[in-house]
Amino acid sequence: MNLKKNKVINITEVCGFERAIDKKKYPAGSCYIKLSAVDEFVGQIKEEGEIDSRYCVFIPKEGINTDYLFIAVSRSFPKFLCRYRTTINLQIDVVSKFELDWHEEKEAQSYIVKAMKQIQREIELTEAQIEREKNQKKYYLGNLFPDMK
């Protein structure tokens, strides 16, 4: 497995894309980005479902690791946005120029997905710990001078 062996590919090599259509069911693992009032947010649906029409949907081709696709799109989208956004909206035809850094090896993709999931778990644990400590601080400060209530 060689993690440094990646190449730049066009989004159309790994998935199709379209402006989301109302009431259309999209497959699990599809990624989406905003076209209206666009920001750097990239979403992914975990189960088959509908997506609002203000989004562009990336529908993965057969055999594509959808978790890896989400990571690749998330990492490449801010750079693409800086280059191609001309107003607060993004034009659907410009999305065809979207390029991804892509690892061809399935083993490398699986390794990256596993590593990113572990990092995300650590982030969530740390955020939960911070929240618990904030609540603990609030409790202790609230009870610091009990006679002053």
Q: Model features per residue range: what roles?
A:
Residues 1-20, 27, 104-107, 125, ...:
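Non-catalytic DNA-recognition/assembly elements of restriction-modification systems
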Residues 2-6, 56-63, 79-80, 90-114, ...:
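Proline-centric
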Residues 29-31:
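Structural motif
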Residues 34-76, 85, 91, 95:
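A short beta-sheet element
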Residues 77-80, 121:
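A common structural junction motif
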Residues 87-90, 124-128:
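Alpha-helical membrane-embedding segments
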Residues 112-123:
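Hydrophobic structural patches
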